[in-house]
Amino acid sequence: MNSQQCVIIGIAGASASGKSLIAKTIYEELCRDLGTDQIGVIAEDAYYRDQSHLSMEERVKTNYDHPKAMDHELLAQHLRSLKEGDSVEIPVYSYTEHTRMSDTRTMTPKKVIILEGILLLTDPHLRDLMDASVFMDTPLDICFLRRLTRDVAERGRTMESVISQYQKTVRPMFLQFIEPSKQYADIIVPRGGKNRIATDILKARIQHLLAK
């Protein structure tokens, strides 16, 4: 598989802005056209840096909304390998242990790779690897309420810890890093992951790139 046959789409935006939902929708709908083995989804969260050498007390203090928390170098390396036709081992990250697990997830080369993550557009090397980029422009108060519900229900967090993290790092880092990265997006999507028109536009763009 050569680089022209691998279309990489990056979907960025605030935590709980609808990135995973629109990525899932596009994945499922393109799978019907291309087959499940031709499309892959990679979450930026899998590339949080390994913290196994730190105590749990130290891990919970990490600023997970700062670009330095991400191993973007490894992600870029994996994307280049996939474009060159090689399989990669994607890290598995634990939200409860706040570090990588020993397991990995094998991804084989795909025709379409959908990236989703809060800080994707802050890295120029990742932007250079993308064929199209998206920013989910969902109001921050809505994102916070979604995040609060999700993290308590799915990630073993307390309500107090989620609120504290939002005040200390999530909102400040959004304003400092994530929101400014919107300028690099090819498509800006309002109203969250259920925006049908935006989904159709993005699918059409992917299909156009595949037809080249």
Curated annotation (Swiss-Prot):
Task: Check the record and name the Gene3D superfamilies matching this protein.
Answer: P-loop containing nucleotide triphosphate hydrolases (3.40.50.300)
Q: Which residues bind ATP?
A: 13-20
| Cell membrane is among the record's keywords | no
- Please give the InterPro entries that the UniProt record associates with this protein: P-loop_NTPase (IPR027417), PRK/URK (IPR006083), Uridine_kinase (IPR026008), Uridine_kinase-like (IPR000764)
Listed A to Z, the keywords are:
ATP-binding, Cytoplasm, Kinase, Nucleotide-binding, Transferase
Q: What is its EC number?
A: 2.7.1.48
Q: Which GO terms describe its cellular component?
A: cytoplasm
The source's domain of life comes to Bacteria
Q: Which pathway does the UniProt entry assign to this protein?
A: Pyrimidine metabolism; CTP biosynthesis via salvage pathway; CTP from cytidine: step 1/3; Pyrimidine metabolism; UMP biosynthesis via salvage pathway; UMP from uridine: step 1/1
* Catalytic function, reaction form: uridine + ATP = UMP + ADP + H(+); cytidine + ATP = CMP + ADP + H(+)
Where it sits in the cell: the answer is: Cytoplasm
GO molecular function list: ATP binding; cytidine kinase activity; uridine kinase activity
- HAMAP family, per this entry? Uridine_kinase
Q: Which family does it belong to?
A: Belongs to the uridine kinase family.
What PANTHER family does the database record attribute to this sequence? URIDINE KINASE
Identify this protein by name: Uridine kinase
Species classification: Bacteria, Pseudomonadati, Pseudomonadota, Gammaproteobacteria, Alteromonadales
What's the encoding gene here?
udk
